[in-house]
Each structure stands twice: as C-alpha cells, then as structure tokens.
C-alpha cells in the first residue's frame, strides 16, 4: 500500500530475519530493497513507518527521529507516558512529523459518528459503548488492553473532542498465564459528564467492531463489520417522567425510524498513509498528532495501574511521571523513502 501512495518513491524494508538469507533472495521474495539492520537503512530514507511489537515502538522511533526522519508509528505510540512524551518532545525539537497509527481516526464512518455527536443530533450525549471482540489473536508480549483498546480510546477521544479524566479497568486471564484476554474499561470524561465503556476480548465467538452512542433524543451505532451500513441512526429515546406528574408515572419511550446514511468508503490505512506523506511535503502537523498518541498512552498507563490496583486512576496521576525508559530493539520495521 505504501508504494501506491502519491509522493512515495522507494520503499525499503528492515527485518532482522533478513540476516538469515542473501540479498538477492530477500529482495526477490519481498520486492523491495531490504536490510537486516536499521542502521544501514537510515541514511537511505526520509521517513519511517514502524509496525513492530509495542515495547519497541518508542526506542525505534527515537532512533529515527534522532536521525532526522519523519515517523509514523503503529498504536500504541509507546508503552509508558514518559516514553510517549519523549517522542513528542524529540520530534518537536528535530522539526519532523510524528504521527501515531490511529487508523480509525481516518475512517469516514467514525467521522460521521463524530459529526452526529458533536453536532447535537443525538441531543445530550449520555454515553459511548465500544466493543472490540474476536477469537484471538493472542499476543505474547502484551495483554488485550494494549492490543485492542488503543483503537477505542482514540475513537472515544476523537468523537468527544476530549481526553478522559480517569480510567477504571476490570480484566481477567483465561487462556494465557501472564496476559489478560478479556477486559472492560470505563473512561470518565468528567468535563463532559460522559463515560465511554470499552469491552475488549481475545476470547469471543464473534468478531465485533462496534461503537454505540446514546443520547437523550437519538442513538447511533457504528458497526465496522456491516458492509454498506456502517452507520445506523435510531430515532429512539427514553423520556423521563414529568417532575410534576403523579409518583407512579413511568418512563415513556419514543420509537421512530432507523436511518442508514450513505457514507463514502475510503480505505482508512490508505488515507492515513497519504496524510502522513502530505504532512511531510507541506511541513504541517498531522490531524492525528503525537499529542493524540500521548493521550492514548496516558489512558493505557492508567488502565494498567487500575488493573493492578483495582481502583479508578486519574490521568493527572500519570501525566507527569517520568519513570521508565524505552527499551527493546528486537523488532520488524518497515521504512519508506519519500520522493
């Protein structure tokens, strides 16, 4: 997909497994110039795309930024708030583009959901409910929260135009002895009076990718698995009893139409890649910036503390933490030369 992006010249690959085969074979098999060591590739590229295990994201990105390269890094941008802040500060100091791979923020259906919520079409927003479920794929280096929740945290922040003030998590291990495979997160957006509830699982019979927004007047379901009808608007609501009515008066219900507006589809990954290249060419800040990635990592760190200590954790508690240092360079990485 990178090679079909307007503005991209050569694509160079870096994978430590390439050290096991000869130059001709690795280039013939992958169709790109390939290196086993990133130090050899850095002088030949203008920008870097990092798609590696999460623990390696920050150290690899820092190395690329130090070499003056623009960076698109897969979610999560880092595994600690301190490391994510280092990336943001380093990119600003180097004058390079830093963009986290929050792919769903480039999804037209998610943009439609945001417009409906922020435009007041649902009335007063009560809550968001997100579900990201499937049977697998189990990861060996992170739990289900770090694997799947970054998507729904970024979607929630994007739709609401805010960051959570606190995170509460419940999680459990059923198959993997070290990593939670099912988790429930509650993100409190106290300034908005809204919560986003997130259910992530590697242990579910169905593949679910869904966000529900419930308001005082209408409700919306974004279902990424629904071909052609990813957005469905429900003219439904619950009407509270009149405060002047008799004590036994109950809740009334409004049941109206269900509408699925046409939302033109464009592959989000392609949109993301093109935006990254365009930002490099125009020397502009991405719509999904390093600060967006930092906010997601802060929520993830809160989630890990909440999971361990079984309590709500405020983002303010981890926002200033500088403990921990990025480590771990054993990874697969893709590099792209922009020309």
Describe each region flagged by the PLM.
Residues 9-10, 278-296:
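Glycine- and charged-residue-rich phosphate/anionic-cofactor binding loop of Rossmann-like
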């Amino acid at each position: 997909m990178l090679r079909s992006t307007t503005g991209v010249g050569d694509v160079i690959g870096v994978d430590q497994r390439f050290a096991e085969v000869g130059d001709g074979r690795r280039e013939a098999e992958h169709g790109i110039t390939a290196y086993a060591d990133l130090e050899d590739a850095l002088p030949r590229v203008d920008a870097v795309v990092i798609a590696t295990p999460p623990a390696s994201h920050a150290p690899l990105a820092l190395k690329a930024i130090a070499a003056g390269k623009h960076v698109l890094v897969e979610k999560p941008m880092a595994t600690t708030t301190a490391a994510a802040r280092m990336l943001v500060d380093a990119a600003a100091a180097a004058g390079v583009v830093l963009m986290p791979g929050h792919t769903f923020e480039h999804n037209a259906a998610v943009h439609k959901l945001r417009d409906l919520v922020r435009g007041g079409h649902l009335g007063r927003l009560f809550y968001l409910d997100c579900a990201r479920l499937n049977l697998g794929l189990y990861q060996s280096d992170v739990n289900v929260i770090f694997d799947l929740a970054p998507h729904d945290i970024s979607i929630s922040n994007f739709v609401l135009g805010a960051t959570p003030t606190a995170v509460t998590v419940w999680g459990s291990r059923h198959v993997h002895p070290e990593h939670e495979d099912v988790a429930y997160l509650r993100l409190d957006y106290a300034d908005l009076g809204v919560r986003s509830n997130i259910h992530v699982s590697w242990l579910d019979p169905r593949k679910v990718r869904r966000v529900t927004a419930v308001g005082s007047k209408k409700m919306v379901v974004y279902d990424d698995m629904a071909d052609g009808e990813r957005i469905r608007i429900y003219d439904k609501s619950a009407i509270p009893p009149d405060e002047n009515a008799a004590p036994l008066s109950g809740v009334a219900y409004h049941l109206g139409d269900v509408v699925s507006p046409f939302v033109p589809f464009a592959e989000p990954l392609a949109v993301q890649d093109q935006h990254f290249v365009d930002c490099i060419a125009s020397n502009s800040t991405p719509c999904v910036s390093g600060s967006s990635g930092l906010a997601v990592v802060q929520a993830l760190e809160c989630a890990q503390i909440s999971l361990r200590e079984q309590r709500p954790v405020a983002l303010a508690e981890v926002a200033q933490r500088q403990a921990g240092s990025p480590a771990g360079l054993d990874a697969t990485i893709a590099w792209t030369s922009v020309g």
